[in-house]
Amino acid sequence: MVGNQIIGGMIRKAGGFSFQELNLTVDDIASMSKGGAYLSYDFITRPAYHHAVLTGNTEFLRLMLRTVHEYGIDPASLIHALQNHDELTLELVHFWTLHASTPYTFHGQTLPGAVLREHIRETMYENLSGEHAPYNLRFVTNGIACTSASVAAAALGLRDLTVLTDADIERIKRVHLLMVMFNAFQPGVVAVSGWDLVGALPLPAEAVAERMVDGDTRWIQRGAYDLADVAPDTPVSAEGVPRAVALYGSLTQQLADPASFASRLKHMFSVRQAYGIAASRQLPIPDVLTPSLLIMMHELPAGRGIQITALNFVPDPLEEIIVLEHVPPGPVVDMLN
């Protein structure tokens, strides 16, 4: 902790900028936010929003969002990310160490943190790997090697990625966009990888067998991609990594199509920037009646009003009345349309 604060202070004195990506308890992330790195990687809600995608239930996600508030962490100080070069970690350190005995309410039961952790992990492993999704692989004992697109495929119950139809790809894209919206329509930094932009699928394990001899299954999620169609017919990168199947195509192709994944992202990010959502202040997370619903409310900068992010984690339409306390009446604007 002290080392983090010293390094952060030295970087600030040099006019630099820093962030830390240690997978820590919420207690430690809160402590580091006071005098340490400017930003912390959001290991708090990252496993939780994937859990919501896979189960269609936002209860654990709401629990973790409220935990952020409980510990006085400003969501604007977090880097909310989609896929990166590492596995989707399911370590859930917060419930493993300091809060193994702390009671939590989940699905109507009171569970110690250690039991809640194992329940979440078992659900994630079952839904995101093994028989249900054989294209994703466990990484050692605390995570799963996967891509954002393969998370979406698993959530949709698609077992064989070699026989995807155009309709399947469109459904994967919609789930992928849901994940982007959760991360982008809240305060803080949103991080999207090149693998996300092209809709990369995991490589077959045999394609990177030599790189996985030490058990590092993460190589299946690190397939090569070509954002600008520089070498569209090249099957292997200059470093010898096989090209991943890109469900959405290159950026060059996508930006010519207003309905493509990248074009939809471009629109989302323009809305995020226009309204100053990154610098907004998140209000308490409301209760909901429908398990698949998540509501986040944000006070926009410069008194521009209250922004509401309403996300449905299942494909079925829903209707619910939410009472917004302490929100002044005013005109309602659909920011995306």
Q: What is each PLM-predicted segment?
A:
Residues 1-82, 93-108, 199-231:
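Active-site-proximal helices and loops of the catalytic beta/alpha 8
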Residues 12-21, 190-194, 276-283, 330-334:
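Acidic/polar loop patches that form or flank catalytic/metal-binding clefts of enzymes
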Residues 16-21, 297-300, 305, 322:
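Catalytic cores of nucleotide-enabled group-transfer and carboxylate-activating enzymes in metabolic
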Residues 49-51, 303-306, 337:
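Short, surface-exposed beta-strand/loop "edge" segments at domain boundaries and coil↔beta transitions
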Residues 72, 78-79, 83-307, 313-317:
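Loop/helix patches that line or flank the sugar-binding groove of alpha-linked glycan CAZymes
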Residues 313-337:
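C-terminal beta-sandwich/jelly-roll accessory domains of carbohydrate-active enzymes
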